Curated annotation (Swiss-Prot):
Keywords: DNA-binding, Transcription, Transcription regulation. GO terms for molecular function: DNA-binding transcription factor activity; transcription cis-regulatory region binding. InterPro entries: DNA-bd_HTH_TetR-type_CS, Homeodomain-like_sf, HTH-type_TetR-like_transc_reg, HTH_TetR, Tet_transcr_reg_TetR-rel_C_sf. Residues 32-51 bind DNA. Residues 9-69 form the HTH tetR-type domain. PANTHER family: HTH-TYPE TRANSCRIPTIONAL REGULATOR RUTR, MYCOFACTOCIN BIOSYNTHESIS TRANSCRIPTIONAL REGULATOR MFTR-RELATED. This is Uncharacterized HTH-type transcriptional regulator Mb2274c. PROSITE patterns: HTH_TETR_1 (PS01081), HTH_TETR_2 (PS50977). Pfam families: TetR_N.
């Protein structure tokens, strides 16, 4: 027998998956809580018990999605080389991700690019800072405040993801990955 907490987690997961499918189909700016509930097979009050509004659902969905991508791309070591390899691979996946690209072309993206750090960005900064601290101890990453370094790494990678399409005629996917690798290695040495 499933516990109520498993049912609750499954319902939350269905809601987030429904939100993701709405974003891909309609774009972030046209997603409604009613459509998310319909696709998840739940009532609107069920959604409201978990999130206060559509924007909160979007934030949770993005955080969950980015965390899943991070889990899919292994970190093969504790040094700078392994970390840079993972960051470049994650950036490559996110550049080709329908959900992320749908979000990138929305008003929501403008908020998280120009006005404030979102939850997923903060999670990435904290995770990167922890990994950079380990790499600093081994001497493969230069000294400095790991959180500041992580924030700059996020900005570099985020810019690459956002701008890949506009520079595609100059930097195809492979060249972009090569240049991002050089940029990150140069910054972290």
């Amino acid at each position: 027998m499933l516990s109520m907490s498993n049912d609750r987690a499954d319902t939350g997961g269905r809601i987030l998956r429904a939100a993701a499918s709405c974003v891909v189909d309609y774009g972030v700016d046209r997603v409604t809580l009613a459509e998310i509930a319909r696709r998840a097979g739940v009532s609107r009050p069920t959604v409201y018990r978990r999130w206060p509004d559509t924007r909160s659902i979007m934030a949770s969905m993005l955080t969950s999605h980015i965390a899943a991508v991070l889990r899919e791309v292994p970190l093969d070591g504790d040094d700078r080389e392994a970390l840079v390899k993972q960051i470049v691979a994650v950036a490559d996946r996110l550049r080709g991700d329908d959900l992320i690209m749908s979000v990138m072309h929305s008003e929501l993206a403008r908020v998280y690019i120009t006005e404030r750090l979102g939850t997923s960005q903060q999670v990435l900064i904290e995770g990167l800072a922890a990994r950079l601290t380990v790499a600093q101890r081994s001497g493969s990453v230069r000294s400095g405040d790991a959180r500041r370094l992580a924030t700059m790494v996020l900005l570099i990678a985020q810019s690459t993801i956002q701008s890949a399409d506009i520079v595609d005629s100059i930097l195809d996917s492979a060249a972009l990955a090569t240049e991002l690798t050089h940029a990150l290695n140069g910054y972290l040495c």
